[in-house]
Amino acid sequence: MSDCNNVNTTGSTTPGSSDIDFWLAVAKNDFTGYSNVSKFGINSTVGSGGFESIWEGSSLYPWPTDVQTLSVVSGSANDASGGTGARTVEIQGLDTNWDVVTETITMNGVTPVVTTQTFRRVFRAKVVTAGSLQSNADEITITGSTDSNILAYISYDTIGMGQTLMAVYTIPNGKTGYIINLNVSSSKDSEHRFRFMVRDNAVTDAAWNVKEYMSARGGFSSWRKYAINKATEKTDIDLQVISNSTSAASGGFELILIDN
């Protein structure tokens, strides 16, 4: 499924089953108006002070309140055109109309590069081309030019991760999402509480609502959804965690997008 965010939806087959053949057909673009999304992330320093989003920021995700350009910069001069690290980075998100937008920028090391496109949401970034390191040479941050919040990280942990690790997403305009799977894991045998939060931005002053609440101790847990949750266009999704001791936690979710 490679990138798994914005699969082209072309074809003429009508879906008729719920087994693995159906999900494979969606991934192969066999169904008109259907696409799949796989989101996953990690929070390396979960604590007990309050819920945090499962992303590299180790905090609640700072959801933007308006559309803005983005500033992209690395901690290493090697992440640059002609460098040994990341040379180009693709950013994926939503524009002012909540439609999917992507932009590929050429890195300039420790000097910030500003996008030409404006973004209302950012839900993934990845290294597209790289030098001899075959990934990023240091942490790359993507920051809102207006609110100055870091909205995405491409992490570096001995080696570059090559893309963001963030279990947050927003349903694009003209789509409806159906959540079919959740998974969570933690690094310590201590109590972790996970909650799956959504916010419908079609509603003025929309509140966050919890759709799933799970407790787990050390290891991996997965839930295949049969009573499937529905998320309408412009809905924010945020997988969050809290722990009774400092630990790392990861998690993700899968959903099917269907054209309205």
What are these regions (language model features)?
Residues 1-5:
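A signal for long, low-complexity, Ser/Thr/Asn-enriched, surface-exposed stalk/shaft
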